[in-house]
Every structure is written in structure tokens, then in C-alpha cells.
């Protein structure tokens, strides 16, 4: 038996079907959490955004127009906009450079430490990017969306997404190269 499509589930949610809403959450929650965590830099804020995304699904399901866009694209747009709103509100009031826990791996302790340090440096550099560039990188590289879909989510042209990605990649390269040089110099001094 085929699983119901997102459009079918949203129609059921519009009729008050809680099980359909849970099914949509089961299907999309992990990606919304990952997107929000990368955008916001911490898990607690990401969980709040993900909850708000699905609260909006519940409260606005009757407005969904099947065929106008993919449901997943709409969810990404809602999550991205909520993240951008949250970043704008906290600008100047909170340190955006807080580094969340990095991904773990199976290699030995030394390699795990190196991987965590690299992940932390990349995450810190990502958090220093301007909001729109960060959103473009997160959608493209971490959410594996194409430029057309990212453009739709961000409400810009494909060319604008390509420009945002180009500038973001350049800034990340410069930030990480500068940090690498500083790290090497500090190791030479301490050696």
C-alpha cells in the first residue's frame, strides 16, 4: 500500500486529522531541525523553530494549494523565514558565534578531536556569514536542495542564489584559511 502524499496529508490536517500532522512531522521534522540548527547555531532554538513550523502547518493547512509548490519547499521556506526572523531579533543581543556540538565519527580519539575542531571552525565561520548567505549555504549544502528550490524558498532569483553562494563560499574560504594560518602560527610558537 502506498504512503499518502504530502498533499493528501495536508488535506487531512486541514480537516483536523492529528495523525496526518504526526505523519508529516515524522516525514519532515529531521530536515527542519537540521536546517534550523545550521541557521541558528544551537539546538534549543532549532527545536523551537521546528515546533513553530509544524504549528503553522496545523493552523494554516486549509490554505495549502496543491500543485502551486512542493510541500517540502513550502516547509523549507517557512523554516528559513522563521530562522531569519529570529536572527534579526537577536542581532546585537546575543553572541551568534556560539559553537554547537560538532558531528562525531568512528575514528580514533585524535582524529575525532580533529574532526570536532574542524566542524566547530566551519560552524563558527558559517555563523559569521550574513543571514542570506548563510541561508543559501544551508539550503544548498546541508539540505541538498538545488538552486531553483533554494531560490523559491528564499524568494529570490536563481542568479541571486548563485551570487549568494559564491560570496558565502569565498567568505568561508577566507575565514577558514585565515584561521588555519593563525592555528599553524600558534603551534609553531608553542613548539
State what each model feature region is.
Residues 14-15, 41, 52-69, 89-91:
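Sigma70-family region 2
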Residues 59-66, 77-97, 115:
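Arg/Lys-rich amphipathic alpha helix in sigma70-family domain 2
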Residues 48-55, 69-81:
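Structural recognition of an alpha-helix C-terminal capping motif at a helix-to-coil junction
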Residues 2, 14-23, 33-52, 158, ...:
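Short, charged helix-capping/linker segments at alpha-helix termini
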Residues 3, 86-105, 181-185:
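Short, basic/polar amphipathic helix motif occurring as a linker/hinge flanking DNA-binding modules
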Residues 123-135, 139-160:
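Helix-turn-helix DNA-binding module
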